[in-house]
Amino acid sequence: MSVDLAFDEQELLPAVAQDAESGDVLMLAYVSEEAVARSRETGYAHYYSRSREELWKKGGSSGHTQEIEEIRVDCDGDAILYLVEQAGGACHTGYDTCFHRTLDGDIVGEQVFDPEEIYE
């Protein structure tokens, strides 16, 4: 890596996934150094689950993968941006993006799959 990344005390960084074509923000997750390395090696987004305390590939269960077109780093090196080609929905709730609701609770995104059919 030619840019120094400023991982936090848990050795994680926030990672935003953005659709490379539309510019839509798809999700926010966290990455470890290993997740970044795996993403670069495979060309597919990998993250670190804070609740399960493990590395995971986006779409590993659902098939809704994120093929990485570019990885960008913010000015402080403490967050990264995955520019991706999203296959299927990005959100585990079935929506195209995890940002599918307003603060008032209005649904503004599109549900593109039924999570009960995917995550049995």
From Swiss-Prot:
| Cellular location(s) | Cytoplasm
Keyword terms:
Amino-acid biosynthesis, Cytoplasm, Histidine biosynthesis, Hydrolase, Magnesium, Metal-binding, Zinc
Q: Does the keyword S-adenosyl-L-methionine apply?
A: no
**Which enzyme class, named as a word?**
hydrolase
Co-factor(s): Mg(2+); Zn(2+)
Alphabetical list of NCBIfam families matching this protein: PRK00051.1
Q: How does it assemble?
A: Homodimer.
- The protein's name in its UniProt record: Phosphoribosyl-AMP cyclohydrolase
Which species is this UniProt entry from? Natronomonas pharaonis (strain ATCC 35678 / DSM 2160 / CIP 103997 / JCM 8858 / NBRC 14720 / NCIMB 2260 / Gabara)
